[in-house]
């Protein structure tokens, strides 16, 4: 009788409408107690329960367990369900976690469930166990959450009769269940609530039955499997997005995406019934996933939608909460609302247990890692859950709560007087600026020395003046070489770059300058002994710079010497004396910006303008031995002034080769590097060191010019010499 009295008291408490704590936010507890109007009978029960238990404050649970077991299990009214697999009595709030921890994933447990015939008896039984005494629930009058009712009724219906009597199972009429052959039947009006209870169970994955259970267990499953079976069939039909490979063990179709990692590509390609080729569908799926429309992301939302729909459709009569358990329910509701990632609306009619265990992140997901939800189904769920659930084209309903699409960013932040130099690099002083400016100026100056200067392009010589371009290779190892001229012997000056002096010196060009390689400077011209010097300063920057260093260039050119050994003997036969085009290297006045070049002379002009070695005029001087303008390979550059050249020519001393070396400006600047440079003519071969005396090295003329202009200049030089 005591059990029935306690059950009647609990039912009376359930029938009362307990006000929500949200309505009393900021007010005292006394106002809530007055509104709740708790009877004195509850207080008597509390006193009675305190006799059989320890202190009430010692029985109060910690905050983490309050959502599962309530605030104080010593006097809270709560309900238990029995697991079909291990026959363990657990609370409905912790039933899902119990199944996942003890019996594996819920999807596998649900996959083994056969579709039993419907029977409207699931919501009739209530497993009433109290901390101090049990309470009874009827489907029509009891206010309970859909999850508690579905789970409790299902597991209780599967229990053997011995277990049910032991656990105080009761019916609304107060009649205990005596035999398994008498399942309680409900009137037809009670079927819709039972039907709605069943919708949420498959989504929670808690519908699982033991294969050896008594026959009364099958009616308790009522409409669960048909509902979910239709949903599974709808998912299996979409082969354009899902794997579709049939599992040989379970005989079920894989509902993962086309990019399933479980089955091989060959197995997925063999699936029949796809609208397009497998590769095309995979490419489309990946393209959609890049745009943020991946069905894999939508599948968790589909699960949430299925979870929420039944709780929203519940009629107002099927609502929750025991009178004494109301504080725990409202507490967990408010605790749950602190997380703004709940993207879908929650029904106020559902209890705290449903809120805690049916989170949008799916069971034991990581609730606090993503405080801001992803827009439109971007909820974070494990890949296994999303693949198990498959895909769905249904869109998510707009969420009720406010959420942000990205984490918040500060409008401003303190830099502590620093400056942003590069992404993530802040500087607090100007020392780096000075260093960078000095380094950049050094680099710019270094690079500018190697930049090519703009020089007027040289035109090709006329066809009637150009003889066969026969030339012998010049030895690049020599410090300075000059083309040897057949006919009247001249005093050649090497086109070396001389150090700058106070007088105007011969223009300096670094080794390998192709634009001025043929412009070999002459210290004395044919017209007299007066030295001709260019007004061009000696430190003129290089118009072109050889890519190879002089030492490397000399090695490369030395390799060619052996190939062209036979060139002098051929040229000896091909040079017919006076008819051969004679060439002399002269320096034109560059005051007008004209570059120096080599002028070609005919035989007649050569005869008229010939001169002796001592600088005096003569009719026709016999051709003397060739003069080589080579100096010692590693001599220091000796500056030669123009006045010295004049005095030497006027005194009548025999002309000698200038002992100057051809050093580039770069080597002069470095001062201590003994690298030899050479004058490389454009498209001309170098003369060998051991070439015969009568072999002439013809140099291509750099810039064509009329013979008349050359004769006028030479006559002017003659008059000055006299």
Swiss-Prot record:
Organism of origin: Homo sapiens (Human)
What InterPro entries does its record include? Ataxin-7-like_regulator (IPR052237), SCA7_dom (IPR013243)
Q: What keywords sit in the KW lines?
A: Phosphoprotein
Bias class Pro residues marks the residues at 181-191
Q: Which residues form a coiled coil?
A: none
> Compositional bias of type Low complexity: which residue ranges?
541-556
Q: What is this protein called?
A: Ataxin-7-like protein 2
Keyword check for Phosphoprotein: yes
Q: Where is this region: Disordered?
A: 106-228, 288-317, 347-403, 531-600
Quote the biased-composition stretches of kind Basic and acidic residues, using this chain's numbering: 290-311, 558-569
Modification sites for Phosphoserine: 575
Please spell out the taxonomic lineage of the organism that makes this protein. Eukaryota, Metazoa, Chordata, Craniata, Vertebrata
């Amino acid at each position: 009788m005591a059990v029935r009295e306690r059950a009647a008291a609990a039912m009376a408490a359930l029938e009362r409408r307990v006000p929500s704590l949200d309505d009393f936010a900021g007010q005292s507890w006394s106002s809530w107690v007055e509104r709740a109007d708790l009877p004195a009978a509850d207080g008597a029960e509390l006193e009675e329960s305190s006799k059989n238990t320890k202190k009430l404050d010692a029985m109060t649970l910690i905050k983490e367990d309050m959502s599962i077991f309530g605030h104080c299990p010593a006097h809270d009214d709560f309900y238990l369900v029995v697991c079909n697999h291990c026959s363990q009595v657990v609370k409905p709030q912790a039933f899902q976690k119990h199944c996942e921890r003890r019996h594996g994933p819920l999807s596998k447990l649900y996959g083994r469930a056969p579709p039993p015939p419907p029977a409207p008896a699931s919501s009739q039984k209530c497993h009433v166990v109290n901390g101090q005494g049990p309470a009874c629930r009827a489907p029509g009058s009891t206010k309970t959450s859909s999850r508690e009712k579905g789970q409790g009724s299902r597991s209780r219906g599967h229990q053997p009769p011995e277990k049910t009597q032991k656990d105080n199972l009761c019916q609304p009429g107060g009649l205990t269940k005596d035999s398994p052959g008498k399942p309680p039947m409900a009137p037809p009006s009670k079927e819709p609530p039972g039907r709605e209870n069943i919708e949420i169970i498959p989504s929670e994955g808690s519908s699982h039955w033991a294969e050896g259970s008594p026959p009364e267990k099958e009616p308790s499953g009522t409409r669960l499997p048909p509902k979910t079976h239709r949903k599974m069939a709808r998912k299996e039909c979409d082969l354009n997005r899902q794997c579709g490979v049939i599992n040989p063990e379970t005989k079920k179709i894989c509902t993962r995406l086309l990019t399933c990692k479980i089955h091989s590509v060959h197995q997925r390609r063999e699936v029949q019934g796809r609208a397009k080729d497998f590769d095309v569908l995979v490419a489309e799926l990946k393209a959609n996933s890049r745009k943020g429309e991946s069905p894999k992301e939508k599948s968790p939302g589909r699960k949430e939608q299925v979870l929420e729909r039944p709780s929203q459709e519940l009629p107002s009569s099927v609502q929750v909460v025991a009178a004494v358990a109301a504080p725990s329910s409202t507490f967990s509701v408010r605790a749950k609302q602190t997380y703004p990632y709940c993207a879908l609306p929650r029904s106020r009619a559902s209890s705290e247990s449903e809120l805690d265990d049916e989170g949008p992140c799916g069971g034991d997901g990581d609730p606090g890692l993503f405080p801001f939800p992803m827009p439109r189904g971007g909820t974070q769920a494990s890949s296994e859950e999303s693949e198990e659930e498959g895909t769905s084209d249904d869109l998510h309903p707009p969420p009720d709560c406010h959420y942000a699409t990205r984490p918040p960013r500060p409008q401003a932040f303190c830099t502590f007087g620093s400056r942003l130099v590069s992404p993530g690099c802040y500087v607090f002083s100007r020392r780096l600026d000075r260093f960078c400016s000095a380094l950049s100026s050094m680099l710019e100056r270094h690079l500018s020395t190697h930049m090519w200067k703009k020089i007027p392009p040289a035109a090709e010589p006329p066809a009637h003046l150009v003889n066969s371009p026969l030339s012998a290779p010049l030895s690049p190892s020599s410090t300075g070489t000059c083309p040897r001229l057949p006919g009247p012997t001249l005093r050649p000056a090497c086109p070396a770059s001389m150090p700058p002096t106070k007088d105007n010196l011969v223009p300096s060009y670094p080794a390998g300058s192709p634009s001025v390689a043929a412009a070999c400077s002459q210290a004395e011209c044919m017209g007299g002994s007066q030295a001709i010097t260019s007004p061009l300063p000696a430190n003129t920057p290089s118009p072109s710079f050889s890519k190879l260093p002089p030492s490397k260039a000399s090695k490369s050119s030395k390799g060619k010497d052996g190939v062209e050994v036979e060139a002098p003997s051929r040229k000896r036969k091909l040079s017919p004396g006076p008819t051969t085009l004679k060439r002399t290297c002269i320096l034109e006045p560059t005051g007008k910006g004209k570059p120096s070049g080599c002028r070609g002379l005919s035989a007649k002009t050569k005869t008229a303008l010939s001169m002796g070695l001592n600088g005096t005029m003569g009719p026709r001087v016999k051709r003397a031995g060739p003069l080589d303008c080579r100096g010692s390979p590693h001599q220091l550059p000796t500056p030669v002034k123009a006045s010295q050249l004049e005095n030497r020519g006027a005194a009548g001393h025999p002309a000698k080769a200038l002992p100057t070396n051809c050093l580039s400006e770069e080597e002069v600047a470095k001062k201590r590097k003994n690298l030899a440079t050479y004058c490389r003519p454009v498209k001309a071969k170098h003369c060998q060191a051991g070439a015969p005396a009568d072999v002439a090295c013809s140099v291509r003329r750099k810039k064509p010019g009329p013979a008349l202009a050359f004769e006028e200049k030479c006559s002017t030089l003659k008059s000055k010499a006299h």
